[in-house]
Amino acid sequence: MAIGTCISIITLNVNGSNASTKRHKLAEWIQKQNQYMCCLQETHFRPRTTYRLKLREWKKTVLANGNQKKAGVEILTSVKIDIKINTVTKDKGHYIMINGSIQEDIRIINVYVPNIGAPQYIKQMLTDMKGEISNTIILGNFNTCVYQWTDHAERKVIKKHKP
């Protein structure tokens, strides 16, 4: 199927998808969005988990999980898109990189950046990929603020004590 020059991808931090009710509601929501691909972060699956997000008309699923029940990323592709996956690179739950083709070569990277050290993690990831960036889509949860002055995590609360 020709997709022209556009590909629609949704990305969502699900904050865990082990509960069956949550998986079913998530599956219904994704089906209604009518997209070509879906990238999920914080799936919290373990490597040998039997839980899966089951979606009709979604043919390929690629997961990256850590040993613990935290982090985790997933890429789902719809039957509406003819993607040929050549290689998959993943780490322990923080990113998946798919090299493939949809009319031409493309790289899709779904990232869940750790809470601590996010800017350094992102910088290192981009440095490692230097020279391999053409036709690359990087998406996910970067756990960082776009503008430093909007980041409330570093503010300290000063309490005044009355004598």
Residue locations for each model-derived region?
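A shared catalytic/ligand-binding motif for oxyanion handling
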Residues: M1-P163
